[in-house]
Amino acid sequence: FSVCNMLAMPSTDGLFHRAIAQSGAAHHTFDPEEGSGIAAEFLGRLGNPSTDELLAMDVGALLEAQEQVAADRSHLPGRNQEPFYPVWGHEALPRAPRELIAEGAGADIAMLTGTNEDELALWGVTGTTAAEVDDMVGAITEDPSGMLATYRRRLDVADPGWLACAIGTDRVFRIPAVRLADARHANGADTWMYRFSWDSRAFDGQFGAAHALEIPFAFNTIDRPGVDVF
């Protein structure tokens, strides 16, 4: 997401010649109204401190408030995106990055983008219960039973954890990445896509091809200490 945001920023024009947006796209941002609302929720959790008071606060208190805001928003239909992402509507990012990219921002920069097969497995969703899957899907669509039926047919998988992983991976990573590539292609931008599907051996196979697993392969660091665990 950071790569796409930077490519959309007018001030970065000419600074990059190639880009890799791994497991990323241009949709994880908030408009000014949403950003102000999230900031108000966060500050409210802290007792609405002044700027000086906020700067002097214990980091633990800030992290706790952050987790509380994220938890509160996770139960709101259509608003369960992680709340702490960039806000557009200012000099650095005047409009939504996906709109700027659709209009040609960064089209002169060659890009490789894509996703992993099981992105959301990194967050432990493969252990999700059937009831939790129902709650998750109910928070993102008005037809949860229809969505679950579609994914069961498409994947031929009944396990609720892997269903949750597939749905979340498509929603958060894969579909936005495809839309990013389509937008760039419409502007004649050199764009390549990948789909990483190498399954990790970690956690008794519950990791699959999780988020970030492709990094050692992309940067040829698979021989680094600790990488062999996965």
Task: Name each model-derived stretch.
Residues F1-S2, A26-T29, E119-L122, S200-F203, ...:
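Flexible loop/turn segments at secondary-structure boundaries
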Residues S2-T12:
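Short glycine-enriched nucleophile-adjacent loop
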Residues D13, R18, Q22-M136, W162-A186:
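Substrate-access "cap/lid" subdomains that shape
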Residues N116-E117, R154, F196-D199:
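Histidine- and/or cysteine-centered catalytic micro-motif in compact active-site loops
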Residues V133-D156:
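Active-site-proximal cap/lid insertion segments
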Residues A149-G161, N220-F230:
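Extracytoplasmic/periplasmic substrate-recognition and gating elements
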Residues R174-F230:
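Mobile gating loops/cap/lid regions near enzyme active sites that modulate substrate access
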